[in-house]
Amino acid sequence: KILATSLLIEAFLYEEQTRRGISLKHFDEFNDVADHCTVCHKCLTPCPVDIDFGDVSISMRNFLRKQGKKKFNPGSYAAMLFLNATDPTTIKIIRKTMIEWGYAGQRLGYQLAKRFGLIGSQTRNPPATVGKPPLKAQVIHMINKPMPGHLPKKTSRALLGLEDPAIVPVIRNPARLNEDSEAVFYFPGCGSERLFGQVGLATQAMLFHLGAQTVLPPGYLCCGYPQTSAGNDDKGQAITTANRVLFHRVANTLNYLDIKTVIVSCGTCMDQLLKYQFDKIFPGCRLLDIHEYLMEKGLKLDGVTGTRYMYHDPCHTPIKTYNPLKVANDLLGGGVKLSDRCCGESGTLAVTRPDISTQVRSRKQEEIIKVAAEINQETASTENPKIKLLTSCPSCLQGLSRYNDDTGIEADYIVVEMAKHLLGSTWMEDYIASANNGGIERVLL
């Protein structure tokens, strides 16, 4: 990709210097190279010339947008519409149409394509992804792995009645509140709040269980990372600046709470929030993933029988203070195996370039099957365990859920799995009832 980009730049320079006029076909190739990147930055480590192609890809996308040559993509447009929305009614409408009905339609398409044998050859031996595939192939790429079902009907904020952007919610457990109760600021992000609301609720429920005072941001907020990585740097910067100003206002309003920890439950949010200079908003604070926080507090699952766990460490891992696999093992009682490789979802990649996603998923599926076979081999003599694939990223949760049909392995979030075992199978209903029964203080911003 580095060579391809260098050659394209050279072609631009050559045509400009020889006054032949610049061929617009170069922009198509530029788009294609820029699309082949999940912005995970993992290619920097082995790169012999220290080029971070994630940053280069973002620059290429910004260049194409500014030149008016970035190709319109309906999938990307729809995803950004959902992420940029802050009005509760707009979010509700988009969730109903795009997520609920759209996902159901995609799953129906998958079932039909599977029945007529249209998927097998494409997923077994994914075709090359240079240039745009034909329309029929694109459609099959889009439906060759089913979207997850059984999503919460409402967002986590809607379930708690906290959609007013003029209110700062402070959630605390009155039964466990004392002078030493720690105050934390929890930034749920889009994935844990709008899409997989159970993740945001499980995070809050565990903090509630620990007796922490949890401060939530007012209203629906996106961190700005998806916009920046998609090549819309202006929008990403605008969101980041607006959020930082808002958080300063929150800090001033709640200056009587000594907030020393900012909690996230999403890796891309963590990457973006590291740029927010939180030490100037809440002096002396640190950024932690919810799983790191729970590990520090000594929470763990003991004696879970009949289930073995695999852990998928996201490309944008939110666990940056400790070793991710160690955190997973500590929380889940040991015996957790790492499932390597990218899941292929990568935020909006799966809807913008499903052909590239198909290639990535092919390799990931091999890895899941291999690790599952290792677990079955280890436990063959004693038990036949149920295997679960856990992660710590909402986008990865969606991506990993799509392998369920082919591998029979269920995907979930570590914090959700912990909530089920530590707080009971009705943890969500119990938490919502407790929070709504005197557990929420609504502070006017």
Question: Where are the regions that the model predicts?
Answer:
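Ferredoxin-type iron-sulfur electron-transfer modules and their immediate structural context
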Residues: 1-36, 48, 55, 62-69, ...
